[in-house]
């Protein structure tokens, strides 16, 4: 095709020939009305014109390309297909941001930086925004009852097949059996998606839904921030990356190193932060201790280098303000609270854009670190860097996008708060061999009181056989994954419950912490919902990720205790806060442009504007200790906001020699509304 010839000449930098082929291809696409094929042609023309220095012409082509992308995406009623489609077009958004920033450098007063931030927002979390918009209506109201019944049937079938898949994979099976069942699961998911799409198409209110509104820079400044809050939005690019720093009165941009360089450093920092988590390398206790000592020694240097890369250019602007972080790529794994506080030094290229478009250019430059994949420390002139964690001076809040925060505020502003304070689900039964099945009620009361002074257990130390292999194949392919009892969570629940009046608290422990309770609607009466249990991640099928609740009933019979993400989306949960105290609840499959497909999204869609999640597997006892401290600041005499309470609890933990390592306190982050 002509477009491929255009691309071939572009790679050879034969720009005139490339443009000619692309323009011929564009004329053909327009003459036959092939809008889908017009997308890559316009993208190619934008690249050619950028190389020729014709930036305004390049902008015309890339904007036209993205208008078609977003139009075609909007025609698909499946949120999953929308997100997948947009993921394939992320290079278009990256090109547009780079183009606008080049225009910005040439004319800093023309508002190009604002336009670049707007494009960054267009590229992010669009399916989550769509879902939040859909939450405004009852999608099943006024729809053919047969369609609704079919959806429920397929949901039950999917749950049954998911459980059957786990049972199969936990016993003896052939590769053919596993492949056949996986194909059936995939087919059922496709049928369920198709049924839901039909429900949307036939819903009287769905057609009237407008596309979710993306916030402008002016709206961010006016509605989402205050004088004590900054927005830091990262846009990672192949040649260079950008940091957009927004205050109520200004927009500043900083040029950062390329995506590959930042992501390599970020992944290394994440590995070092989570080094104490169980792993599959085995070895003697002495070998493990040696690995931890090596990680502890390397972490300060690597974290300092990451801080230099992504924070130091803007250090002079941070002060002691609250930081709203919109991360991208591997930066989503990083708890910014654990990074060292940068100090003012040589900043990156900076251009300030006032609230009314008045801009001033900074004179400093940024020297990026070495591109070596072995990640040596930068040979660039060292910036002054404090050893103090960012947490000490700043509340840190994570957002999928600024537009998501606006949507969450819009939805929660309309509703009445739930009448009661706190619901807690903790310490479920995971195995038929659990001692609580064998003891009398009085014995159970004595035997299940955990000793908070005893070391916690992790999956690596205590792996039950049933379901372990299933999760290995079905979820993360991690042979350390299992469901040991979290012995400190009952102590955690009891301590937290004491902080609110008894008639305002609901506790579901042991057998009562089950899936049926969550799906019954009972939790909608509570402003705070706290889960203290395991989670599981299905990287291949994100909708089948979820939370593990009681897998055994009081008669000792196995039951479905897996609360899956696709079920969380269907909850009606108008809570102010959901806390997921289990391991790795903030992780999930990354889809470009959408971010991590974690449990956070499901609970936001269900109605929670803020969710606390974890980034790695933390031992039972320190996790429970942190949660109790958090609730003391949240519900105790100080009555702090959720963001401030989490920060205060983490600072307190970090000053305890026993839990001073960031692994113990930095993994929990607040996602969503900061107020």
Regions found by a protein language model. Give the residues of each.
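Cysteine-dependent hydrolase recognition
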Residues: 399, 404-535, 583
């Amino acid at each position: 095709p002509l477009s491929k010839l255009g691309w071939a000449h572009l790679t050879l930098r034969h720009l005139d020939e490339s443009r000619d082929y692309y323009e011929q291809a564009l004329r053909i696409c327009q003459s036959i009305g092939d809008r889908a094929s017009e997308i890559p042609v316009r993208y190619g023309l934008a690249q050619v014109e950028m190389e020729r220095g014709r930036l305004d012409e390049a902008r015309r082509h890339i904007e036209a390309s993205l208008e078609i992308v977003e139009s075609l995406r909007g025609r698909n009623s499946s949120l999953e297909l929308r997100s997948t489609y947009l993921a394939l077009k992320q290079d278009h958004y990256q090109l547009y941001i780079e183009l606008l920033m080049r225009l910005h450098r040439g004319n800093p007063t023309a508002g190009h930086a604002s336009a670049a931030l707007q494009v960054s927002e267009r590229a992010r979390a669009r399916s989550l925004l769509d879902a939040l918009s859909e939450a405004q209506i009852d999608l099943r109201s006024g729809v053919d009852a047969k369609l609704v019944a079919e959806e429920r049937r397929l949901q039950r079938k999917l749950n049954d097949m998911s459980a059957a898949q786990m049972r199969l994979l936990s016993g003896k099976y052939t590769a053919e059996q596993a492949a056949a069942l996986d194909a059936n699961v995939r087919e059922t998911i496709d049928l369920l998606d198709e049924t839901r799409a039909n429900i949307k198409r036939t819903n009287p209110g769905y057609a009237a839904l407008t596309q979710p509104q993306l916030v402008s820079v002016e709206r961010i400044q006016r509605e989402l921030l205050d004088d004590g809050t900054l927005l830091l939005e990262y846009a990672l690019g192949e040649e260079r990356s950008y940091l957009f720093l927004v205050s109520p009165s200004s927009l500043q941009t900083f040029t950062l190193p390329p995506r590959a360089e930042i992501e390599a450093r970020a992944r290394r920092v994440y590995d070092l932060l989570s080094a104490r988590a169980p792993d599959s390398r085995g070895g003697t206790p002495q070998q493990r201790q040696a690995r931890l000592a090596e990680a502890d020694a390397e972490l300060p240097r690597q974290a300092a280098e990451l801080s230099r890369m992504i924070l130091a250019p803007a250090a002079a602007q941070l002060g002691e303000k609250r930081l709203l972080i919109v991360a991208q790529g591997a930066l989503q794994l990083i708890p910014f609270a654990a990074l060292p506080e940068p100090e003012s030094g040589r900043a990156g290229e900076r251009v300030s854009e006032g609230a009314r478009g008045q801009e001033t250019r900074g004179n400093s430059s940024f020297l990026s670190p070495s591109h070596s994949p072995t990640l040596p420390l930068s040979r660039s002139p060292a910036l002054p860097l404090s050893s103090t964690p960012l947490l000490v001076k700043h509340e840190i809040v994570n957002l999928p996008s600024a537009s998501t925060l606006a949507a969450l505020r819009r939805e929660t502003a309309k509703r009445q708060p739930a009448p009661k304070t706190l619901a807690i689900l903790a310490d479920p039964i995971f195995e038929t061999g659990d001692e609580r099945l064998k003891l009398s009620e009085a014995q159970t009361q004595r035997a299940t009181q955990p000793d908070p002074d005893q070391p916690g257990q992790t999956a690596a130390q205590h792996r039950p056989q049933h379901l372990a292999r299933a999760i290995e194949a079905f979820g993360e392919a991690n042979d350390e994954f299992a469901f040991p009892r979290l012995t400190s969570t009952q102590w955690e629940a009891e301590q937290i419950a004491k902080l609110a009046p008894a008639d305002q608290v609901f506790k579901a422990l042991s057998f009562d912490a089950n899936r049926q309770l969550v799906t019954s609607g009972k939790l909608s009466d509570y402003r705070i919902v706290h889960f203290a249990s395991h989670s599981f991640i299905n990287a291949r099928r994100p909708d089948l990720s979820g939370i593990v609740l009681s897998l055994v009933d009081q008669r000792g019979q196995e039951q479905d205790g897996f609360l899956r993400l696709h079920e969380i989306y269907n909850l009606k949960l108008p809570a102010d806060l959901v806390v997921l105290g289990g391991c790795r609840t903030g992780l999930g499959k990354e889809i470009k442009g959408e971010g991590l497909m974690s449990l956070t999204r499901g609970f936001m869609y269900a109605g929670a504007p803020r969710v606390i999640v974890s980034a790695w597997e933390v031992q039972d006892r320190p996790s429970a200790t942190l949660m109790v401290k958090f609730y003391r600041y949240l519900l105790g005499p100080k009555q702090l906001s959720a963001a401030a309470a989490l920060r205060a609890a983490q600072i307190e933990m970090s000053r305890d020699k026993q839990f001073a390592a960031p692994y113990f306190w930095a993994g929990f982050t607040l996602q969503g509304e900061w107020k």
